[in-house]
């Protein structure tokens, strides 16, 4: 099987995962009416999906070393597809939570890490790896940006249940395509799996995401959950230090956190997804609340961002040949900030919504330009035997960015509601995070890819 054909199932897997995370938002009201629950009940299912995926991403990634990357990919897809079918047939909220929140969450934690591990191992030079990550990251961005449009169209024209059946159909196709993938490194079932570390890291990440999701809802719970998360993660670091001293393989090696280049690139990854999901949330609320747009109209407006992501992702290989990865990350932040600036300058309450299109397009181009090199820098900073660990850590950081973007943007909107121009305040606040990301990118070395430890 050619490398290009191997890339197709990996990219489709990432598309499905990103689509699932964004398409539900436009179907909340229809789902709540159909299964006899409240909007809050459906939002709880979405929250539990995010929690399950975030908590299990690092343990799921580590399992790829023991059980094999291809095995984890296919099993993860199978679990995910089963969850999609269960969710499509759900008569009540409890069944929806089992299918969507639990099974799709567990499936995502198993199937997402192998995407990036296999891409890193199969494509072994900067240009080809940039092309691979460009396609994968492009599909991630398109899935996230086009999810509301596709979900809105299907929900309005047919039923929200069909969005889950569509996911199941794509997953079935990907499983067939994945059967011919050649895992470049055999599974090693003799490798130690750190169960205690998996529990501690999962619990710690669980409370981090819970705390983020409580921002703007209950300040006391935010503090309590962050303290719990800090305590569990500190216990986790003590645990892995103890295992390393005993010469036992931990869930994550402490040396992962000593790589300055990788650490900086993961900061940029986190902020990229924060900017993308945060700006998407703010602009969606603005269009629907202030402009009175429907879900379909809002989704159509976001095709500008989708087009920007697609254009920049398709150019990833050519850009990697001409510019250093660190330069592309910096350029991506600058373009994204320019897009936010255009939106603030042109998209006031009295202007035509068409004035938002240039800003959305620039945001899409900027995010698409920097996602690929950021992933490339992180994955390329470590040798093959560390790909399972760094992939899980990297995906967890990105998922945290997505959660933070929506939570922070929502909190700022609520806090600024009594003032004039709350949406402008929220977008300006996101721009400040973009400046932090740009500052982190400025400290990346000129040629970070290839510096492995």
Residue ranges and their predicted role:
Residues 47-61, 112-116, 303-315:
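Central cavity-lining transmembrane alpha-helices of secondary-active solute carriers
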């Amino acid at each position: 099987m050619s490398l290009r054909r191997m890339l197709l199932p990996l990219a489709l897997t990432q598309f499905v995962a990103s689509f699932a995370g964004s398409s539900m938002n436009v179907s909340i009201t229809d789902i709540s009416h159909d299964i006899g629950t409240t909007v809050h009940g459906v939002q709880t299912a979405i929250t539990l999906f995010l929690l399950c995926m975030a908590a299990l991403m690092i343990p799921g990634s580590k399992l790829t070393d023991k059980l094999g990357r291809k095995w984890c990919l296919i099993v993860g897809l199978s679990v995910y597809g089963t969850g999609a079918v269960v969710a499509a047939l759900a008569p009540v909220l409890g069944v929806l939570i089992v299918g969507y929140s639990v099974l799709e969450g567990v499936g995502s934690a198993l199937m997402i890490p192998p995407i990036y591990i296999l891409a890193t191992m199969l494509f072994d030079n900067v240009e080809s790896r940039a092309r691979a990550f460009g396609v994968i990251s492009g599909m991630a961005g398109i899935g996230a940006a086009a999810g509301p449009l596709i979900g809105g169209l299907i929900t309005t024209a047919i039923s929200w249940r069909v969005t889950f059946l569509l996911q199941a159909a794509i997953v079935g196709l990907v499983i067939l395509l994945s059967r011919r993938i050649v895992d470049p490194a055999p599974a090693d079932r003799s490798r130690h799996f750190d169960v205690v570390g998996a529990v501690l890291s999962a619990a710690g990440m669980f409370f981090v995401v819970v705390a983020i999701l409580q921002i703007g809802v209950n300040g006391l719970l935010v503090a309590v959950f962050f303290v719990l998360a800090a305590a569990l993660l500190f216990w986790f670091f003590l645990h892995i230090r103890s295992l390393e001293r005993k010469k036992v393989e931990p869930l994550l090696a402490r040396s992962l956190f000593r790589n300055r280049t990788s650490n900086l690139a993961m900061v940029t990854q986190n902020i990229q997804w924060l900017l993308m999901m945060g700006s998407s949330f703010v602009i969606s609320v603005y269009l629907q609340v202030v402009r009175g747009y429907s879900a379909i109209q809002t989704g159509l407006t976001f095709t500008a961002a989708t087009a920007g992501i697609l254009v920049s992702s398709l150019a990833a290989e050519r850009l990697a040949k001409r510019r250093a990865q660190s330069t592309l990350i910096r350029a991506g932040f600058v373009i994204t900030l320019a897009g936010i600036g255009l939106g603030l300058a042109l998209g006031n309450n009295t202007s035509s919504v068409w004035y938002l299109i240039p800003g959305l397009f620039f945001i899409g181009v900027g995010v698409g330009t920097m996602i690929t090199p950021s992933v490339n820098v992180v994955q390329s900073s470590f040798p093959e035997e560390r790909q399972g660990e760094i992939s899980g850590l990297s995906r967890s950081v990105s998922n945290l960015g997505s959660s933070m973007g929506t939570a922070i943007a929502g909190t700022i909107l609520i806090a600024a509601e009594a003032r004039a121009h709350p949406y402008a305040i929220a977008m300006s606040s996101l721009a400040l995070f973009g400046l932090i990301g740009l500052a982190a990118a400025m400290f990346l070395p000129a040629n970070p890819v290839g510096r492995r430890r």
